């Protein structure tokens, strides 16, 4: 059964029996965004035909950006007019020191300034109003919404704690537009827009939950695996102020639109045997048995017929005739994922090994989206491939320049000036450039973009760190490739679309090396993340090569392994190659990561996790090894995990 597109009402009722909100699933974020945009366009046109206004409130952010891009396309190419649309801000940061920042500025760039919505139809929340005017403004804003006839359509995202707009956990379900103090999580989430947590305003003016609930139609969207946990709480959890989005369970016309990754934790996806009969394949069987081990706190080989029957897995007993047979199958499957030879073991039977024994040594290419993803995600495997004699190359796809703070640049500028002071650098350019760059960095304001020269300096810092890390592992410097894909080089967090120039660069490195084995970042959860775009560049390059007969043989022999980044790990049912790491190798991996000094405490994009990258990597690798041990397999210090990408 297709769990995200049930074939009839009966199947839908079965798979959704624990869901308190109506859910529609899409295979990709782009498909979901297209559906939302079409729905909004249909409503606009329907109201236009009736001579009516369409009153909307829209959420900003990366989740909704594709929706707005499609609406703009419809406006430009299909004649969709927004003249009958009346718009209300959902929230705004307060106080805003720069009107180029904030929610309304972002929405203006994404949609409002690009279509023909009349300026008088746009109701914004000023981020710079006097404090004494806030209370009266909030009352006036509610009155303006009422005068417009109420909100017809409300588009929402969902925060990692279940917040809708800036209604944070604990917010009253009868709250109206008001000033709220932002919690640490909300400020952490906003630091990408403002540059750092310290620059994020301490408060915001937001529509209240009751204001949102009064909208005639509410649509909440979420894309990406990082949203899956909170989506489950909102959809299947209790109606409770600890999860503000759960308030929508009592709204008559709410729809939840998710991609497969965001829906991953819903019962219908995570443990489908709880709500229906399953079409069992090897991966689902492994997932069910691992889940059963967690429920019973037993290793695989100690599970009994009673355990399977008590937890709703009697279908597996029927299929395998006994718990013993099922246990042995899953245990062996997991055992065969473990290998100390990620490039293949020469002169060995590779029937049950993840990677082939021949050819040996292999030409291996590691793609790293940023200059440190390789060592963070697979540093132990990287070092072992080199040690075992393979011809290893690494390709750093982007410069990573925007992830270097200004203090790092100043530190290197001071070094260059000191070098010149020692008389080791001839000419006056060093002093002149030092003063020029220092003046710029000193006067730079929030929202200002770095100059191209400053960005080049930041890229140079990261290039030096990556080279040092590779040298530490024993990789020859002529095997290090910096691709500097153009889509990344915008100077801001907003990247350009993947283009032909990016794909051409990736294709060239593939043609040059012709690897037998590739490692790529498989973090596909974020539809706009650099990792995903880099992966799409690799896929596009491969697709072009597959169209030429000369490359068919190479592609048929090339194996692609996906690793995950600093944020998450593959689920146990997905893992196809598990590379054990000894305590000594783990310390070596830590030292390799530490070569990336600019990405330690001062890195701008550490995410919501306070641990340093080497700590996250070690904790993740320890956790994977612990899972294997609890399932009854060998107890290793740490494990790096990979999933094979199979080309159709």
Locate each region found by the language model.
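Structural motif
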Residues: 55, 86, 152-153, 217, ...
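Short Gly/Thr/Asp-enriched flexible loops that form oxyanion-binding sites at enzyme active sites
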Residues: 67-73, 164-176, 528-544
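Conserved phosphate- and dinucleotide-binding cores of soluble alpha/beta proteins
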Residues: 2, 10, 20, 27, ...
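Short, glycine-rich nucleotide/cofactor-binding loops
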Residues: 61, 366-375
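Glycine-rich N-terminal segment of FAD-binding domains in flavoprotein oxidoreductases
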Residues: 46-77
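N-terminal glycine-/serine-/threonine-rich phosphate-binding loop
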Residues: 1-55, 349-351, 358
